[in-house]
Regions:
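A charged, aromatic-enriched C-terminal amphipathic alpha-helix characteristic of glycosyltransferases
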Residues: 317, 323, 330-391
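Short hydrophobic beta-strand element within catalytic cores of glycosyltransferases
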Residues: 293-297
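Short alpha-helical segment that forms part of, or immediately flanks, the ligand-binding pocket
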Residues: 262, 284-289, 303-304
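Acidic donor-binding loop of glycosyltransferase active sites
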Residues: 263-279
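Catalytic core of nucleotide-activated saccharide and alditol-phosphate transferases
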Residues: 91, 96-202
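Conserved catalytic-core segment of nucleotide-activated headgroup transferases in glycan assembly
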Residues: 173-258, 262
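N-terminal pre-catalytic "stem/leader" segment of glycosyltransferase-like enzymes
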Residues: 1-133, 299-302, 314-315, 364-372, ...
Length: 402
């Protein structure tokens, strides 16, 4: 074993999480290469992230420097063009940076931003920084309004205390029950399924003691390719009864459609949620709409908002505890349609409340349109328009389709 001098505290925790993810290296040389690749990748990512999150707050509204941040990637959904209401994902240590970049390009227009928190805001340092950024934004763009749609009541309270306009509206309301549903003709082949990207935060290793397990996984670039492939190899080596549902090309997991993901859910008896901290976790709602009971670890972020103790168990983050919880739910054998029905009752109530809020918002902004009585969002699959800030600003400025 190579000594890891100089690693302590949180860095040690991150190192252990990384090694749990990729597994033991085959040799000292391979281990060194993995660690070196990870260090280089993290350094580059941190530098890019720092630039991306700071630059939008520093640029002038007009002039040759105003478009320096035009290449930053972002996504949004246009809820209404007149009045202009935009649904925008935000997250990270400086959550308002995409609004700062897009807001400068829409400074002369009245805009309402509805923000979706992709990562929990229940973090004091992030809230404190965001409070200062909110004050800056209000002074810079007086025609704009930002409304935070919060995944938990605690998140709403913290954002409101920092000066934000916030309501409780968990983003898992956006998951489509038309796509994620029970499929009676699909036989159950796995005790559990885990839909989790390639990331140390997802703690895939906690599921390794489950006898029959399906993985749905993908990369968003959090790890260098050499480490991501090592992760895939580790999953493959666990057991002949563990399967990666994604197609693999040169050791790399390909993308599944939402319909294919739902089919994999229906091949499993239980859905897994194993991270300690993240956002509200779309897949937790996808499981429930497909009729799967859930085994979760204690978590921060809002995925437990729709949990029910009859079919959701929060277990300690230990392999044996996760396995036992899965076995308990297998024994309960709660019908899928029952889980789905009870979930949709909760979702339906909150959607009605949110539609009433949206109707009042549009009226306040000058709309003369009818009441919103049908759910106006198309589901998470394909809902977001993605592009650079420059492209998104041009798209938002297009006239209303006739």
């Amino acid at each position: 074993m190579i000594a890891m001098a100089g690693i302590s505290g949180m860095d040690q925790d991150k190192q252990e999480a990384f090694e749990e993810l990729v597994g033991p290296a085959g040799s000292a040389r391979e281990r060194l290469l993995l660690l070196a690749a990870r260090r280089v990748h993290r350094t580059k990512s941190k530098l890019r992230g720092t630039v991306r999150k700071r630059i939008p707050f520093l640029l002038p509204t007009r002039g040759p420097l105003s478009d320096v941040d035009g290449g930053i990637d972002m996504s949004l959904h246009v809820l209404s063009r007149d009045p202009l209401v935009l649904y925008v994902p935000i997250g990270g240590a400086r959550p308002l940076y995409p609004l700062a970049a897009l807001g400068r390009r829409l400074a002369a227009r009245r805009v309402t931003f509805l923000t979706m928190q992709t990562w929990t805001m229940e973090r004091p340092a992030v809230i404190a920084r965001m409070g200062r950024d909110l004050a800056w934004y209000a002074g810079r763009f007086p025609l704009h309004e930002i409304i935070f749609l919060c995944n938990t009541e605690e998140e709403r309270r913290l954002i409101a205390a920092a000066g934000g306009n916030a309501i409780f509206s968990n983003h898992n309301l956006m998951v489509s029950e038309e796509i994620f549903r029970p499929l009676p003709d699909v036989p159950v082949e796995f005790d559990a399924v885990y839909n989790g990207r390639i990331s140390p935060i997802k703690r895939h290793h906690l599921a390794f003691d489950i006898e029959r397990l399906a993985h749905i996984t993908y990369s968003i670039g959090e790890l260098p390719p050499v480490a991501a492939r090592a992760f895939v190899r580790r999953l493959q080596a666990q057991s002949p009864l563990h399967k990666i549902a994604n197609p693999l090309v040169d050791g790399w997991p390909g993308k599944l459609t939402a319909q294919q993901v739902n089919r994999v859910y229906n091949q499993a008896a239980v859905g897994l949620c194993l991270s300690a901290v993240e956002g509200a976790m779309y897949s937790s709602m996808e499981y429930l709409m497909a009729g799967l009971p859930i085994v979760s670890t204690p978590s921060l972020g809002g995925r437990d908002v729709y949990f029910d103790p009859d079919y959701c168990i929060v277990a300690e983050p230990e392999r044996a505890a996760i396995r036992r919880a899965v076995e308990t739910l297998l024994d309960r054998a709660i019908p899928r349609e029952e889980i789905r029905r009870r979930t949709l009752e909760k979702v339906g109530t909150q959607r009605i409340e949110f539609m009433a809020f949206l109707t009042a918002l549009l009226r306040r902004k000058g709309s003369r349109g009818p009441l919103i009585e049908t759910w106006p969002f198309p589901g998470t699959d394909g809902m977001m328009r993605r592009g650079t800030v420059r492209e998104i600003a041009a798209f938002v400025s297009e006239p209303e389709p006739t």
